UniProtKB/Swiss-Prot annotation:
Hypoxanthine binds at F73, K189, F220, D274. GO terms for molecular function: DNA-binding transcription factor activity; transcription cis-regulatory region binding. One of its GO terms (biological process) is purine nucleotide biosynthetic process. Pfam families: LacI, Peripla_BP_3. This is HTH-type transcriptional repressor PurR. The lineage of its organism: Bacteria, Pseudomonadati, Pseudomonadota, Gammaproteobacteria, Vibrionales. Consists of two structural and functional domains: an N-terminal DNA-binding domain, approximately the first 60 residues, and a larger C-terminal domain, approximately 280 residues, which imparts the function of corepressor binding and oligomerization. Residues 4-23, 48-56 bind DNA. Residues 2-56 form the HTH lacI-type domain.
């Protein structure tokens, strides 16, 4: 494996000059730069990240802890984070925990051992023990994204789920719907509790009673949406609209309802949450609550960089504002 001395020898310059060319730390004449880079290419030289990290006290590596990277919402946020990491010369280590306690614990330990410069956390079900573990690594800058836990050591970006739930339900009410169901994720999750609270607030403002049999529990995946669609189809009195707490469930619900002979939106209206890319191209295109996923990723990374530069900065909370994207799955009844 080639060393910096080999590059310097081939280029006919000092190792210091090679270092300045590679790290862009000082002006070097263009002809000299060309000689150095030609030698780098010929020798297939790669600087030692370990040596650089020891010298600079930085690995230029970010760890990202996520509940489920295959979830379409998460994958779009991850795409935003990765894009901005790449532009800034950082490597992203993605840790997909699957919501498993042991994996969350072990990944946090592993990221600490790898001396990452910072950690992004996007987990909906961190326990108190895990929150304490994050706090124990107080020397590592952290930003918590989406509906993760509060931490005394981390900046936080919140998605304002209560307001999003309110906006979705109010839109249905404004279009004449009074019999409105909601398909939640697991009831114990903070985001679901907030979206249900927003749903109830909009119903209460309109003096509409909530049918508790229509507050359905899912898991943010298609399988429970299919079960919910079968349940709704079999109801003697059906809701005229369903507010789904993410687009994945909304699309699964729509597909099954239409298999069961119910047309969306002619027979039943559906509104989703997240505005994943697929929502626009489904048939019919899904009306949904937009969350700026790539902007969340960008903001999280930028905030983390600020935290890396100023570790003593007091904890901050940044709030994202949800907004409705109107397409073709809500029927106007008034």
């Amino acid at each position: 494996m080639a060393t910096i001395k080999d590059v310097a020898r081939l280029a006919g310059v000092s190792t210091t000059t090679v270092s300045h060319v590679i790290n862009k730390t000082r002006f070097v004449a263009e002809t000299t730069q060309e000689k150095v880079m030609k030698a780098v290419d010929e020798l297939n030289y790669a600087p030692s990240a370990v040596a650089r990290s020891l010298k600079c006290n930085s690995t230029r590596t970010i760890g990202m802890l996520v509940t489920q990277s295959t979830n379409l919402f998460f994958s779009e946020v991850i795409d935003g984070v990765e894009s901005y990491c790449y532009r800034q010369g950082y490597t992203l280590i993605l840790c997909n925990t699957g919501g498993i306690y042991e994996k969350q614990r072990d990944y946090i330990r592993m990221l600490a051992e790898k001396r990452v410069d910072g950690i992004l956390v996007m987990c909906s079900d961190l326990t108190e023990e895990l929150k304490e573990m994050l706090d124990r690594h107080s020397d590592i800058p952290k930003v918590v994204m989406d509906w993760g836990p509060e931490s005394s050591q981390a900046d936080k970006i919140i998605d304002n789920s209560e307001e999003g739930g309110y906006i979705a339900t109010k839109y249905l009410i404004d279009n004449g719907h009074t019999d409105i169901a909601c398909l939640s994720g697991h009831f114990e999750k903070a985001a679901c509790q907030e979206r249900i609270a927003g749903y109830r607030r909009a119903m209460a403002e309109a003096n509409l009673a909530v049918n508790e049999d229509w507050v359905l529990e899912g898991n943010f995946e298609c399988d429970t949406a299919v079960l919910a669609a079968d349940n709704i189809t079999a109801m003697e009195k059906r809701p005229t609209a369903v507010f789904c707490f993410n687009d994945t469930m909304a699309l699964g619900l729509m597909s099954r309802l239409q298999q069961n002979g119910l047309k969306v939106p002619d027979d039943i209206s559906v509104i989703g949450y997240d505005n994943i890319e697929l929502a626009e191209y489904f048939s019919p295109p899904l009306t949904t609550i937009h969350q700026p996923k790539r902007r969340v990723g960008k903001n999280a990374f930028e905030i983390l960089l600020e935290r890396i530069k100023d570790k003593e900065h007091e904890k901050r909370v940044f709030e994202m504002q949800p907004e409705i994207v109107v397409r073709n799955t809500v029927k106007k009844l008034n």
